[in-house]
Amino acid sequence: VTVNDNHVLVTLADGTSFTLPKGETYTFDIANRDYTLFSSNETRTYLLTTANIDDATLIAIPQGWTAVLNDKDLRITAPAVSGDDVKDGELKILVTPSKAFGKVIKMQLRAVREAHFLTFEDVDYKGDANMVGERNWSSLIDSQQYGGPLLYPKNNQLYNWSDANNSFLASELPKGWGDYQYWGGGHAISNYLDMDLTHGDFQHQLAVYYQDAKTGFGGHNGSKNFCVHYGYADNSGYANGPLPYIYFGDGVARVVDHMYVTMTTYLANCVANGNGLTAPAGKDDWVKLVAIG
């Protein structure tokens, strides 16, 4: 292999050779590009991060949608949607780098009459005072992952949360072992992350096995906060009582369109190494996620 400033020359054992042009590293990032569910007539602006790009052009916009692309951002407006209708389609952007092959960026857009997002980020908190008297999500993160005062209270205060005035989703600890504590299951707000599988145990039960490369946080798309589910039904002897669940606190039926899920460090360690209750996952094993509404 011979490399110069512009090409890579590859010579095979039989003497055959071919030349590959050298490309230049380039960047075309759309911030929050996974958030593509819109409410009727909603306009959303996505900030762009670019480097070594000659041109970026919108080459496909779904019918009824509008989109404007410039050097700094992408602005998308959804069509009008009524009733239970759904307007969806694929938006495409042709990106032409300075010294590399171009590529097509795709975004799957979807619009419904009304959409709300539960992010667990403090800036998105819209409810009244929570169980500890604060108007944010972070105050619901326990100071200890196991045995903390919020999830394992010494008084009768029941751990609960509600996304009032937004998605209206809510949850509280079930009576798993008769005492409404997290060892009986529940949905706990967290911002813990841990990439060390030797910490994959109940002492680190609120940590996710994921860290965003840009923000250093453990939530989806680089966000800081998230919700940790704990609770199961099997014959191990360690499951008892009702399973935890999330519901609409105002009693109105709605559709949960999607959610983003990752493994906790506890689960990742069980899959990789096993523990006292389960063997490590083999090549023919699988992990199945089922959501019932």
Predicted features and spans:
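Short coil-to-beta strand junction motifs in C2/discoidin
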Residues: C270-L289
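C-terminal edge beta-strand
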Residues: G23, A100-A115
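N-terminal targeting leaders for non-cytosolic proteins
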Residues: E114-L243, G251
